[in-house]
Regions:
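Short amphipathic recognition helices of helix-turn-helix/homeodomain-type DNA-binding modules
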Residues: 60-65, 170
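Short basic helix-loop element that most often maps to the first helix and adjoining turn
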Residues: 5-24, 49
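Active-site metal-binding motif and surrounding structural segment of the metallo-beta-lactamase
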Residues: 109-160, 266-275
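DNA major-groove recognition helix of helix-turn-helix/homeodomain DNA-binding modules
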Residues: 45-60
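Conserved beta-strand hairpin/beta-sheet module of binuclear metal-dependent hydrolase folds
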Residues: 68-117, 231, 235-250
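Recognition helix of helix-turn-helix/homeodomain-like DNA-binding domains
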Residues: 26-42, 63-64
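Cap/insert and terminal regions of metallo-dependent hydrolase folds
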Residues: 134-136, 151, 229-237, 241-336
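Metallo-beta-lactamase
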Residues: 158-236, 332-349
Length: 351
């Protein structure tokens, strides 16, 4: 996308006319039109005003970041030598406006991986926790100690008493670590939906148009002296609208990837371009996969639209291979160290 095209895109995204921008910049309509038509480059002073108007850095305005770049800091598998792997997920996301940490994995493994990948976590300006399980939020304290300023968006129910049940052992606590009170002033608690800005929206509790909770049957919430199935009201998803593309990011999609995708479609008017996250079709501690019937139904339900799916973590190898026969090249594996850059010219992968 040329700079002139980028200017037009930004203006149209805000629902503004050319004369509105000219007035805001204190220049004539003709002068502004020359910028959008590619007849003249703005002077630095005008660029600074444009950047301030759109709340962008100069780099983002002039196109040094005209894409959404997603790097898997941590996943169950490591795609590069020297990186840690652990059961969990942590993604680093760069947009024209933001540097985002989405989930922190089970511990501090994501820190060494970030260093090895050249990711500066001190520059992260906001973090998102997808849900209240320790394989996604176990590294929360580690992040807060490395980065002392980024707000952390998490659902108001994220600190619930969440457990995994087993036939032959006691219920195991899998909620967020205790002792995070010292960082409470960093937390921004969300509910069903929160619009952070024009790029980022968080949403939870997608309507159940598809029954996909069977794969989460052993996951529970403690209520009094007993347990009840976890309804995953504490799970939220990140919808990104940036660089002319739409990206949907989920942690485990416990509420069902089809339901989450359908909710995103209702907000966008179309399916997102790219999805990142687990499908939760692999159940610990026993390690059984979801039924072939459920996997196939999900695969067929994901066919409409042109969304490219990057998945891993709790999807499981068996389910991934089976889904691959249905979705083909639209299904791609996540692994630690991989990067996908989503821009106007498509997706560029680095592994």
């Amino acid at each position: 996308m040329k700079f002139s095209e980028h200017l037009a895109f930004l203006r149209e995204q805000e629902g503004l006319l050319q004369k509105d921008l000219a007035k805001a910049l204190g220049i004539s309509l003709h002068a502004y039109q020359r910028f959008e038509y590619g007849e003249q480059e703005p002077r630095l002073a005008v660029l600074a005003k444009l950047a301030d108007f759109y709340d962008l850095s100069l780099d983002a305005l002039v196109g040094r970041r005209r894409s959404v770049r997603v790097t898997a800091l941590l996943e169950n598998t490591a795609g590069r030598e020297g990186l840690c792997a652990a059961h969990g997920l942590s993604l680093y996301i760069e947009t024209p406006r933001h540097k985002i940490l989405f989930d922190m994995g089970p511990g501090d493994e994501f820190l060494s991986n970030a260093e090895a990948l050249g990711v500066d976590l001190t520059a992260v300006d906001l973090a998102v926790l997808s849900h209240g399980h320790d394989d996604h939020g176990g590294g929360l304290a580690a992040f807060c100690r490395v980065n002392d300023h980024a707000p952390i968006y998490l659902h108001r129910s994220a600190f619930g008493p969440y457990y995994i049940l087993s036939d032959d052992r006691d219920p195991a606590y899998i909620g967020l670590p205790l002792g995070l009170e010292e960082f409470r002033d960093r937390f921004i608690f969300t509910d069903r939906e929160m619009v952070i800005d024009r790029e980022l929206t968080l949403f939870a509790e997608p309507p159940a148009v598809f029954d996909a909770m069977a794969a989460s049957g052993r996951l529970a919430e403690k209520v009094g002296a007993g347990f009840q199935p976890d309804a995953f009201r504490h799970e939220q998803n990140l919808l990104i609208r940036a660089a002319g593309r739409t990206v949907l990011v989920a942690g485990c999609a416990h509420r069902g990837v089809v339901n989450i995708l359908t909710a995103a479609k209702s907000k966008l008017g179309e399916y997102p371009d790219v999805f990142f996250g687990g499908f939760h079709l692999f159940q610990l501690p026993e390690g059984e996969a979801a039924s072939d019937k459920l996997i196939d139904e999900i695969g067929r339900a994901l066919l409409p639209g042109k969304t490219v799916y990057y998945t891993g973590h709790c999807t499981g190898a068996y389910a991934y291979d089976r889904l691959k026969t249905i979705l083909g090249e639209r299904l791609r594996a996540m692994s630690g160290g991989m990067t996908a850059e989503i821009g106007a010219d498509g997706i560029r992968e680095h592994r």
